[in-house]
Every structure is written in structure tokens, then in C-alpha cells.
């Protein structure tokens, strides 16, 4: 019997009633991972021994009836630090790195007796939108194994979509949770910047990065956010604002809610069938009692350019620490210190990472800083102001998560600009530090379409309220790929 169709609440009831044990649930999850892994390639590391040891310890002390997550397995993106479990960021540079500490998000999960079952595949150092830049493998879309799963958190999305695990963690710098969630038909949230501690997250773009949850349903996503969200003195950007329970508004109606639909989100570059899906969703929200009106976010068209200057600049600084001296990969053909640096970084980083380091170094260089990095920061402010103006009159923003459904493997990975443009709808949310969710909203050519809901800072509970209301009157979240046991 597989438990992957059970919700977290249903699994919790079984555990409390002792109809299953944490060990049995963990063993079954490991079986589900192994039986599907060859098809989708979600994991870099499966921590079988450690997970079973942890499950046995939980069984020994007993399941806490008041702790929903007690004994529940969790998959973790491989750029989030896990003590004594390989954390590679999908890079040759860190192919053998075992951290000596847990990320705060992981420590929070352990504190709730969650079981880290393994580390998921991703684009190298989270730089990519297809999980094809990984040093280890290419992950495949759960619905069509000839398509990409999205990125950079592709493994975390396919692990949930394929029924390997119920819950997973990813990170989102420019859409890296929401895009793969959309491509795989699951729920993925990028929280408000600072809601989840970045301590232990291998840094890419420090002003943009945020850890967030994947789950099959809106409520389970909120339940996982309840676990990982916390203020943290180890992260200077951690926010003190906290919602006691992110599920608190789920189940409430949305009558009177005002939702904005930016005309730019349905314009050039958006697949016509994606546009139709979003407009149908807008009508569904109106049927639920919300008001949906067209607005404008005029500076969003500059988002991709601004993002790739800022994110690459921050990456070029953050990745200086990988030099072959302290830990990780070191080139063995170096004759002096300079050659250690040059050869290690040349051999240890993949092409996309090196491309972004070079772009960022150029943007920060003398003579170009004002023309590129400084100007990008100024336009970022204009993008933030656009959102502020809309949220002065509206509760949420609605739009597609991605301009297309999942594209084919090996189709865009040799065209960086085309790959970058795939994030045009998610990037502005990171630039503004806002919360955004992707939920299943339909299918085009048999592939899932994601609907994005964006809110002002610290309004995750309102986003979940609206997302759950839509989910309650649709069945897209119930449809599953063949690999999960569905008929698609």
C-alpha cells in the first residue's frame, strides 16, 4: 500500500492511531522514491540510513498528537544545508561537501520531528530554469519525461508531483519555486523576503533568495510554511513579522476581495492558451464573489534585465568563496596558488554559473557600475513602486506563473536569453520582495498550467485564502500524472 495519496492530516491520523509507524511510512516513502527515480531523477542524495534511524527514534518516543508534522518525510533542495548529508548545490564544486550544520529551515523541520528523506536535484547553484545545468543529472517533468521540470528547484517539484514525497523545500531567487510548481502541477510558494531564514542556504542572489514549500494542495503548503517560517538572529535579513497560523484564512469565502489582473501579464510572449486559462480563472474568482479588474505594472517589462544584472552581480560576489582552498573541489593540476584558484573555478563551475559570474563581475567593475548595477537598482525601485500603487487599491494580483507550459529537454539550455525570458512573470515578485504562489489552473497539450497569485508583503494567509477558494471549486490539483497513479 502506498501512502502518497494521503494528505498530511490523514497521515497524521494514521500515525497517531498507530495504524502505521513513522518507520513504516519512511520505508514506504523510500520505496516510492526508488520506484520512480529512474523515470524522473528528482534526487541527488537519498538519505535512507539517516531517515530510518530518525524514524525509529520518533517511534520510540511516540507520535505527538498535537504535532501535525511528527514523523512526516520531507525532501530538501540540495542548496539547503543538512548536517552530515551531502549538500552539493548540484555542482562539481561541492560534489563531496557534507555540512557541519543544518540550515535554520531544516532545523525547524527537525524540531517538529519531520524526517529528511533526501536532497533534490536542481540547476547548479540555483542558476537555471530547467534543472538541466546540474552536474549530476537532468530531472524530467513528472507529466512528460521529454519535457523539463522547470528550475531551479525542479527536483523538489517532481518529487511531489510524481508521488515520491508529499512535501519538499525549494528556494526561489527569480521564480525557482513557482515555475517548476507550475510545470509540474503542484503548489509552490515564494514567501515574503525574510519570512524564512536564509541561514544555511547556499547564497546566489542575497537580496532575492527565499526558501519556500512545495505540496500537492494549498493547505498542506501552508502547513509546511508554518514549520519553516521563523525569525532568526543568524540571518540579518530575517523579518520579525509573523503570522501565527498560515492556514487561518483557508476555508473562508473571498466575497468582496479585490484582485488586480495586470495587462502586461497577458501581453506579448504569453501563449494564447495560457492567456485563456488565466482569463477563465479570473471568471472563477468573480463567481466566488471577488472583483477582478485590469491594471498596469508598466515597469515589469524591465524585470528580466534588472534581475540578471542584480542577481549575477550578487552571485559573482557570493561565489568568490569557492576557491579550492577551504572545502569542496580542488583542481589537482595546479602548480601555485593562482593556478589553484583559476583551475579550480574553471573546472568546478559549469558554463551557466561561469556566464553569470562574468556578467556580474562586469556589471560591478569600475566604469560600468553606474551604467549597469546602479541603474538596475533604480529601476528595481520603480518596479516596487508599481506594486505599491496597485496594492493601495487591491488585495491580490492575478496572472499566469509562466508564459508557456513546460518546454522540451535540450531546447533552451543552449539559448541563455530565451531561458531567462521564461522567468519574466515571476522575477518582479523577487525584485519587490513580495509573496507569490503558483497553483494548478488547467492543462494545455496535456501539460499543467500554473496560476500565480501575488500579495503585499506578509499577506501569505490572504494568498492561501484565495488559492484555497479556487482549489475548492476546481479539480486540477486532483489530477495526477501516470507515474503518480493518474491517467495523464
Curated annotation (Swiss-Prot):
InterPro entries linked to this entry: Amidase, Amidase_CS, Amidase_dom, AS_sf, GatA
UniProt-annotated catalytic positions: 77 (charge relay system), 152 (charge relay system), 176 (acyl-ester intermediate)
Entry's Gene Ontology BP terms: translation
Residues of the signal peptide: none
PROSITE patterns named in the record: AMIDASES (PS00571)
Gene Ontology MF annotations: ATP binding; glutaminyl-tRNA synthase (glutamine-hydrolyzing) activity
GO cellular component: glutamyl-tRNA(Gln) amidotransferase complex
Catalytic reaction list: L-glutamyl-tRNA(Gln) + L-glutamine + ATP + H2O = L-glutaminyl-tRNA(Gln) + L-glutamate + ADP + phosphate + H(+)
EC number, UniProt record: 6.3.5.7
The keyword Metal-binding is annotated on this UniProt entry: no
Keywords on record: ATP-binding, Ligase, Nucleotide-binding, Protein biosynthesis
Self-association state and partner proteins as the record states: Heterotrimer of A, B and C subunits.
Family of this protein: Belongs to the amidase family. GatA subfamily.
Biological function: Allows the formation of correctly charged Gln-tRNA(Gln) through the transamidation of misacylated Glu-tRNA(Gln) in organisms which lack glutaminyl-tRNA synthetase. The reaction takes place in the presence of glutamine and ATP through an activated gamma-phospho-Glu-tRNA(Gln).
Protein name as annotated: Glutamyl-tRNA(Gln) amidotransferase subunit A
Record lineage: Bacteria, Bacillati, Bacillota, Bacilli, Lactobacillales
Gene: gatA
Amino acid at each position: 500500500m502506498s501512502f502518497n495519496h494521503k494528505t498530511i492530516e490523514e497521515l497524521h491520523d494514521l500515525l497517531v492511531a498507530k495504524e502505521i509507524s513513522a518507520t513504516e511510512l519512511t520505508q514506504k516513502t523510500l520505496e516510492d522514491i526508488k520506484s520512480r527515480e529512474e523515470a524522473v531523477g528528482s534526487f541527488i542524495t537519498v538519505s535512507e540510513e539517516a531517515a530510518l534511524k530518525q524514524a525509529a527514534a520518533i517511534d520510540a518516543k511516540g507520535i505527538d498528537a498535537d504535532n501535525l508534522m511528527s514523523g512526516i518525510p520531507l525532501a530538501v533542495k540540495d542548496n539547503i544545508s543538512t548536517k552530515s548529508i551531502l549538500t552539493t548545490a548540484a555542482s562539481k564544486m561541492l560534489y563531496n561537501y557534507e555540512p557541519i550544520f543544518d540550515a535554520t529551515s531544516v532545523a525547524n523541520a527537525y524540531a517538529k520531528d519531520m524526517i529528511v528523506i533526501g536532497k533534490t536535484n536542481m540547476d547548479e547553484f540555483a542558476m537555471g530554469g530547467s534543472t538541466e545545468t546540474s552536474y549530476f543529472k537532468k530531472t524530467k517533468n513528472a507529466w512528460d519525461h521529454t519535457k523539463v521540470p522547470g528550475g531551479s528547484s525542479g527536483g523538489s517539484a517532481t518529487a511531489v508531483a510524481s508521488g515520491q514525497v508529499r512535501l519538499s523545500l525549494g528556494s526561489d531567487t527569480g521564480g525557482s519555486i513557482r515555475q517548476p510548481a507550475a510545470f509540474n502541477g503542484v503548489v509552490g510558494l515564494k514567501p515574503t523576503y525574510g519570512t524564512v531564514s536564509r541561514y544555511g542556504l547556499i547564497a546566489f542572489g542575497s537580496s532575492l533568495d527565499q526558501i519556500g514549500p512545495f505540496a500537492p494542495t494549498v493547505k498542506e503548503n501552508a502547513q509546511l510554511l508554518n514549520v519553516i517560517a521563523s525569525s532568526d538572529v543568524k540571518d540579518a535579513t530575517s523579518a520579525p513579522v509573523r503570522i501565527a497560523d498560515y492556514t487561518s484564512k483557508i476555508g473562508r469565502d473571498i466575497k468582496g476581495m479585490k484582485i488586480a489582473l495586470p495587462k502586461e501579464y497577458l501581453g506579448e510572449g504569453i501563449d494564447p492558451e495560457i492567456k485563456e486559462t488565466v482569463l477563465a480563472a479570473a471568471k472563477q474568482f468573480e463567481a466566488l464573489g471577488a472583483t477582478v479588474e485590469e491594471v498596469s505594472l508598466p515597469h515589469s517589462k524591465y524585470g528580466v534585465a534588472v534581475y540578471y544584472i542584480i542577481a549575477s552581480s550578487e552571485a559573482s560576489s557570493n561565489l568568490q568563496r569557492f576557491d579550492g582552498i577551504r572545502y569542496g573541489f580542488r583542481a589537482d593540476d595546479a602548480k601555485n596558488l593562482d593556478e589553484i584558484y583559476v583551475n579550480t573555478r574553471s573546472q568546478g563551475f559549469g558554463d551557466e554559473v561561469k556566464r553569470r559570474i562574468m556578467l556580474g563581475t562586469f556589471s560591478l567593475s569600475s566604469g560600468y557600475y553606474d551604467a549597469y548595477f546602479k541603474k538596475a537598482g533604480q529601476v528595481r525601485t520603480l518596479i516596487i513602486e508599481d506594486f505599491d500603487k496597485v496594492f493601495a487599491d487591491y488585495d491580490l494580483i492575478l496572472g499566469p506563473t509562466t508564459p508557456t507550459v513546460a518546454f522540451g529537454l535540450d531546447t533552451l539550455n543552449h539559448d541563455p536569453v530565451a531561458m531567462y525570458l521564461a522567468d519574466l512573470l515571476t522575477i518582479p515578485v523577487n525584485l519587490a520582495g513580495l509573496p507569490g504562489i503558483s497553483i494548478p489552473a488547467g492543462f494545455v497539450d496535456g501539460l499543467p498550467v500554473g496560476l500565480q497569485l501575488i500579495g503585499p508583503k506578509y499577506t501569505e494567509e490572504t494568498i492561501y485564502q484565495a488559492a484555497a477558494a479556487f482549489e475548492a471549486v476546481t479539480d486540477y490539483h486532483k489530477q495526477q500524472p501516470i507515474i503518480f497513479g493518474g491517467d495523464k
